[in-house]
């Protein structure tokens, strides 16, 4: 009985530790391999875009399909499940473009948690009904029936250890979650 309890505890701890990690591997795919529902949605969102790139993304939670494109000097990422159901829409953002409240709360969180940090990438993330998000991106309609978060990728140093992290903050800059990014080990050189 004692050994069984120890085994269950070890499994639960491993699961909790795994939940705080992030690993992604993206593979470029042809648009013909993407669910028509996803292709149609992205094409209606960005009808003038000629360079939509599709990716199969494998992560610790499963597999998703992602469309990436550049529009009006921003990079958009639209994520779907393999059947074409929308997960979220993300757009790159500069730190000084964030609302002042968000800038202050994010900076306070990072300064409190790390001795030093460097922000690598910021994305504004929208989730909600696909039609509402379509109106938001195409027309700028904001009826606030969607969720806005900020996804921030950065390096942070704690004591002597430096690692890469991805944190999610709500629309006010309140911390939601942080995952340590698992770097991909390669047995060959990248040029």
Region locations from a protein language model:
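Exposed beta-strand-loop-beta-strand "reactive/processing" segments of non-cytosolic proteins
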Residues: 47-79, 135-168
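Start-of-domain marker
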Residues: 21-65
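Short, solvent-exposed mixed-charge patches
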Residues: 189-191
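Long, charged/polar, surface-exposed segments that mediate recognition or autoinhibition
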Residues: 82-125
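Long, low-complexity acidic/proline-rich regions
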Residues: 128-132, 182, 186
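Bacterial Sec-dependent N-terminal signal peptides
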Residues: 1-23, 42
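Short glycine-rich, low-complexity/disordered patches
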Residues: 50-58, 116-130
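A short, surface-exposed beta-strand/turn
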Residues: 76-88, 161-183
């Amino acid at each position: 009985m004692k050994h069984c309890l120890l085994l269950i505890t070890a499994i639960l701890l491993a699961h909790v530790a795994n939940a705080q990690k992030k690993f992604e591997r993206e593979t470029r795919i042809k648009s013909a391999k993407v669910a028509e529902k996803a292709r149609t949605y992205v094409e209606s969102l960005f009808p003038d875009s000629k360079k939509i790139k599709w990716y199969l993304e494998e992560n610790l939670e499963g597999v998703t399909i992602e469309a990436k494109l550049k529009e009006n000097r921003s990079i958009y990422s639209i994520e779907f499940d393999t059947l074409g159901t929308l997960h979220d829409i993300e757009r790159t953002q500069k730190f000084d473009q964030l609302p002042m409240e968000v800038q202050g709360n994010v900076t306070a969180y990072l300064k409190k948690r790390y001795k030093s940090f460097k922000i690598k990438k910021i994305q504004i993330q929208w989730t909600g009904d696909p039609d509402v998000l379509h109106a938001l991106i195409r027309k700028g309609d904001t009826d606030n029936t969607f969720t806005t978060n900020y996804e921030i990728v950065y390096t942070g140093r704690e004591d002597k250890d430096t690692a890469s992290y991805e944190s999610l903050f709500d629309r006010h800059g309140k911390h939601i979650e942080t995952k340590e990014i698992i770097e991909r080990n390669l047995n060959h050189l990248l040029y």
